[in-house]
Amino acid sequence: LWWLFRDNLLPSVTKFVGYARTKLTVAELKEKCHPYMKVDAAHEEKYDEFWALNFYVAGSYDGRRDFELLNQEIGKFEVGKTANRLFYLRLPPSVFETVTVHIRNTCMGLKGWNRIIVEKPFGRDADSSNKLSEHLAKLFTEDQLYRIDHYLG
C-alpha cells in the first residue's frame, strides 16, 4: 500500500483502516512496519502523509460489536456521494468464516462498491478450501471477490 501511495496510484481520498486483535496505536504500527518499508530520504515527507491516512481498530474476530465499531470508524470517512470499501483478508482458516459473516452483516458500505480480497492459499487442504469458497459464495457476489496469491499480497 505504501508503494501505491508513494507512486500516486491510489485515489487522493483513500484512507486505510486496519483491524486486528492486537491493541496498537497507529504510531506503534508505523514503528513496527518501518524497517520493511524501504523509505528513501526523498520520500520521508510522503511517508508521513501516508501514515496520517492510517487508522486502526482493535477487536476480536468473533465479536459482532467489534465489527460494528469498525464499520463506524470506516463510516467517518465517507462524506461524499460515493465511498468504496475494500477489505483485504489475511486470516487463519479457523476464523475465516466468522470474520466474513461479520463483514457481510455489519461492514458493507451503502455508497459504492464493496470488494473482498482473499489471500490464498486459504484452508488447510482442497476440501477446506472448497468449503471456504462455498461459504464466500453465500455471502458475496463473484464480482465482489478477488483471490490473490500470498506472494503477490
UniProtKB/Swiss-Prot annotation:
UniProt keywords, alphabetically: Carbohydrate metabolism, Cytoplasm, Glucose metabolism, NADP, Oxidoreductase
Enzyme Commission number, as recorded: 1.1.1.49
One GO process term, biological-process aspect: pentose-phosphate shunt, oxidative branch
GO MF annotation, one: glucose-6-phosphate dehydrogenase activity
Enzyme class: oxidoreductase
Ligand binding (NADP(+)): 21, 120
Protein name: Glucose-6-phosphate 1-dehydrogenase
Organism, as annotated: Culex pipiens
Gene: ZW
